[in-house]
Amino acid sequence: MATLRVDEIHKILRERIEQYNRKVGIENIGRVVQVGDGIARIIGLGEIMSGELVEFAEGTRGIALNLESKNVGIVLMGDGLMIQEGSFVKATGRIAQIPVSEAYLGRVINALAKPIDGKGEIIASESRLIESPAPSIISRRSVYEPLQTGLIAIDSMIPIGRGQRELIIGDRQTGKTAVATDTILNQKGQNVICVYVAIGQRASSVAQVVTNFHEEGAMEYTIVVAEMADSPATLQYLAPYTGAALAEYFMYRERHTLIIYDDLSKQAQAYRQMSLLLRRPPGREAYPGDVFYLHSRLLERAAKLNSLLGEGSMTALPIVETQSGDVSAYIPTNVISITDGQIFLSSDLFNAGIRPAINVGISVSRVGSAAQIKAMKQVAGKSKLELAQFAELQAFAQFASALDKTSQNQLARGRRLRELLKQSQANPLPVEEQIATIYTGTRGYLDSLEIEQVNKFLDDLRKHLKDTKPQFQEILSSSKTFTEQAEILLKEAIQEQLERFSLQQQT
């Protein structure tokens, strides 16, 4: 048996003592007393902050929402099926934040900014708080740059500016998502970063939107944040704030961003579910008292920054679903009062084949013509009034037996104006083509055509104008004004096309 020498033992002991690192740390620990329905109640955690992240022993994370005298109410960011009563919970000392970087462009992620498109991890060196304060009054400037949606009805009569918040509201299946996605498609080549947030949607619907973006080449400048209908309520509640944090990252880097929240009704329902399970007192329609603050703190983050901050912008298009056209319900009235206008989609118009089914009469943009180029103001200034008068006259005409010639002409013009506002999905128009289309309708060039021929004629006119009068587009894009020269070119193109069209009809 070999004998150990004293000096060897001494050397080993000395090495062990030198390697010993006495590190003492204090951790805020609690214990689970109740768990279920996406909620956990914890005793302990005396030093926790509101909104702080906590970590359970088996790895699930949660957010502290209710801080009570005897326990803490935690909402779980997962199913929590493996959490056991009596297990330990550790406070992390951090408020919820996500990584942010340019690498997120073209990706589909969840509310925790984790990729769900199977294309691998996203490398990011920076992070942002999911909930950060909105820009102050001093940090902002008034909205003055147009954000073109590519939809004639919106760009001519309900203009949206960069930094504006415009609500898209309507019943289910009226084309709300189509208006939002067409707006994203129209940002191609406009140097605008788009974020599409899907809250509580069917996975098949989100997949269809993503496929559409890929086919049209829009994913290059778009980030999709998706929490499906089967996701925990906590993640559905967080998804819009995650999207806003990503959009803010680009806004503060002097970029223009557009964010779609589809839709905030589902987020409010998820928040109501969480609040009721946390035993917060219910208010109107069983929503908690702070549901207005839920949406106001989200939508106030949209802004047009001043020149000192780089003039970046974040334009928000929240979507809210109504029941049977009832805009006086709790969530619709809340969001209407927060936003800078609303685009109202009508199921009656949709069923009548008028798509996009925008009710121009009760839709409004509180920014108004400040968000339009001068050429559009010159051409489309009276369109909304003419359509409103047409709708009024049409209602009257149902009861009148005979109408005078002026009223008949006004009705005929109104029907053609309504016809030119029709657009197929995923077919946004450049502003120059919109101006040509509206001018043709408002100046009476369509009056001689049958209503069924209007859209065919306008398609041919736009193609003819592009092929034979490229100077028209150059004048509008350079001067942003509908000059005399532009008007002469457009009149020539319309006359030529009318002659060609009448010949085609004869043959």
Curated annotation (Swiss-Prot):
GO cellular component: chloroplast thylakoid membrane; proton-transporting ATP synthase complex
Catalytic activity, as annotated: ATP + H2O + 4 H(+)(in) = ADP + phosphate + 5 H(+)(out)
Membrane topology: Peripheral membrane protein
PROSITE patterns noted in UniProt: ATPASE_ALPHA_BETA (PS00152)
Protein EC: 7.1.2.2
Compartment(s) where it occurs, according to its Swiss-Prot or TrEMBL record: Plastid, Chloroplast thylakoid membrane
Family: Belongs to the ATPase alpha/beta chains family.
HAMAP family: ATP_synth_alpha_bact
Name the UniProt record assigns to this protein: ATP synthase subunit alpha, chloroplastic
Gene name as annotated: atpA
